[in-house]
Amino acid sequence: MAEIKNYYFSSESVTEGHPDKICDAVSDAVLDECLKQDPNSRVACETLAKTGMIMIAGEITTKAKLDYQKIARDTVRRIGYTSSDMGFDADTCAVMESIAEQSPDIDMGVSAGKGLFNSESSNVSEGAGDQGIMFGYAINETETFMPLTIHLAHRLAERLTKVRKDKVVDYLRPDGKSQVTVEYKDGKAARIEAVVISTQHAAGVDHKQIEADIKKYVINEICPANMLDSNTKYYINPTGSFVVGGPMGDCGLTGRKIIVDSYGGHGAHGGGAFSGKDPTKVDRSACYMARYVAKNIVASGIADRALVQFAYAIGVPEPLSVYVNTFGTAKVHDEVLANIVSKELDLTPAGIIKRLDLRRPIYEKTTAYGHFGRELPEFTWEKTDIKDLFANAK
């Protein structure tokens, strides 16, 4: 079947004040505090947020001493929920916890030398923390090798937060969402068909004022002018009002924005969430590694886009499979690239952790505006330092 060349594609993002993102941030703040005190911490931390309360639960084995109340309140305060007028208050919300240690059966499979498959004399290594399939994706339509739709959606959500925190638009509240539809012609991004922004705001603000401010200070600052035209549609708070937001408007849960966190519907997703998980959990670390590999393949110039898949079994260090698909854009066969990945890179959890330096307290920064496509110093998986592995592949 021939590939469709003319189509519309949409991606969404959310702000750090979205209830699910509050939970991601709290879970990763707990993880960061564990890793700060004990880099070998095992963490699986879930958070729920609803009106007036936060619940932290999970399995954590660590030498760290944790003040869950402080971690949760500091995180919510940083996001900006500091008054009951907003529907949530960092200083008055209840913080509950239910934490156990990691299951000894899981520990046996993960800890080097304990399990059936990670204790052979030739391969004493940490086993994968779970089974699963993990994907990474990259495309050369933006400077960060991310799909344009999710890139724009993230930047709009990020800008929405910035104008709120900088008080450029002083009636905005923390909760918000963005969505971008791009028209593709002959397989290339041609124009922006639609922009959706939903932003929480103070009561009594005229809807026309919100529309004007969001267009001026958010959309026009982010969306390329040459991709906006007279037919571009704008949907700004399309219900007419968004006063009730955050956990009062919707219950929040860790791990419920996996497509926002990855590629906005492009590529593929194995189903595992990221936040609250230490790097022995391949749901997180192997996805970061897959992005690293895909980005370096595309950055090398040997392909225009790349999808990389790894698969793991719990307790087994080596991946069960390595897959590369460049959608016919590569200068060599995809199996050549897959063989390079398999032979030249250590894809065990220990190898990934070492290469990407993942036992650091870096994770709360990942929770909003994309785990991928932001070239922050801590985001080692965004480096293109192995592109030469692929540049001259034959």
Curated annotation (Swiss-Prot):
GO terms for biological process: one-carbon metabolic process; S-adenosylmethionine biosynthetic process. Gene3D superfamilies: 3.30.300.10. InterPro entries: ADOMET_SYNTHASE_CS (IPR022631), S-AdoMet_synt_C (IPR022630), S-AdoMet_synt_central (IPR022629), S-AdoMet_synt_N (IPR022628), S-AdoMet_synthetase (IPR002133), S-AdoMet_synthetase_sfam (IPR022636). Its EC number is 2.5.1.6. GO terms for molecular function: ATP binding; magnesium ion binding; methionine adenosyltransferase activity. GO terms for cellular component: cytoplasm. ATP binds at residues 18, 175-177, 250, 256-257, 273, 277. It is found in: Cytoplasm. Keywords: ATP-binding, Cytoplasm, Magnesium, Metal-binding, Nucleotide-binding, One-carbon metabolism, Potassium, Transferase. Pathway: Amino-acid biosynthesis; S-adenosyl-L-methionine biosynthesis; S-adenosyl-L-methionine from L-methionine: step 1/1. SUPFAM superfamilies: S-adenosylmethionine synthetase (SSF55973). Mg(2+) binds at residue 20. K(+) binds at residue 46. It is an enzyme of class 2 (transferase). It comes from the Bacteria. Residues 102-112 are annotated as: Flexible loop. The keyword Nucleotide-binding applies. L-methionine binds at residues 59, 102, 250, 281. The keyword RNA-binding does not apply. Catalyzes the formation of S-adenosylmethionine (AdoMet) from methionine and ATP. The overall synthetic reaction is composed of two sequential steps, AdoMet formation and the subsequent tripolyphosphate hydrolysis which occurs prior to release of AdoMet from the enzyme. This is S-adenosylmethionine synthase. It comes from Brachyspira hyodysenteriae (strain ATCC 49526 / WA1).
